[in-house]
């Protein structure tokens, strides 16, 4: 899986860290890329809508990344505990 130029630019802005969150993940491409490249150890992929989150879960499972990427249903940063992730991506919403 290769990221689009826009998503690659977004991913390049995420610093190496233990945990990052992709809010409004849609398909989970950014967290999958960052985990594969060992830029993050763990990722949270969240979306407010079940349909896109189901797609993200499928992509994560097909790529055998479920051990490192957790999916959560919810809006915005409410899916995270305070201090849980050092980096957050909020891109392509709206």
What feature does the model see in each segment?
Residues 42-47:
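Conserved SAM-binding motif I beta-strand of class I
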Residues 17-26:
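Conserved class I S-adenosyl-L-methionine
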Residues 27-40:
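Conserved SAM-binding loop of SAM-dependent methyltransferases across substrates and taxa
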Residues 49-51:
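Conserved SAM/SAH-binding beta-strand->alpha-helix loop
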Residues 1-18, 32-33, 54-83:
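S-adenosyl-L-methionine
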Residues 18, 41, 86-87:
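Conserved acidic residues
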Residues 77, 85-94:
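A short SAM/SAH-binding and catalytic strip from SAM-dependent methyltransferases
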């Amino acid at each position: 899986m290769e990221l689009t130029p826009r998503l690659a630019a977004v991913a390049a802005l995420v610093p190496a860290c233990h945990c990052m969150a992709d809010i409004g993940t849609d398909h989970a491409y950014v967290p999958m890329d960052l985990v594969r490249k060992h830029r993050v150890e763990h990722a949270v992929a969240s979306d407010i809508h079940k349909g896109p989150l189901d797609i993200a879960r499928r992509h994560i499972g097909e790529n055998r990344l479920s051990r490192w990427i957790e999916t959560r249903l919810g809006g915005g940063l409410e899916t995270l505990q305070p201090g849980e992730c050092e980096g957050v991506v909020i891109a392509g919403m709206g």
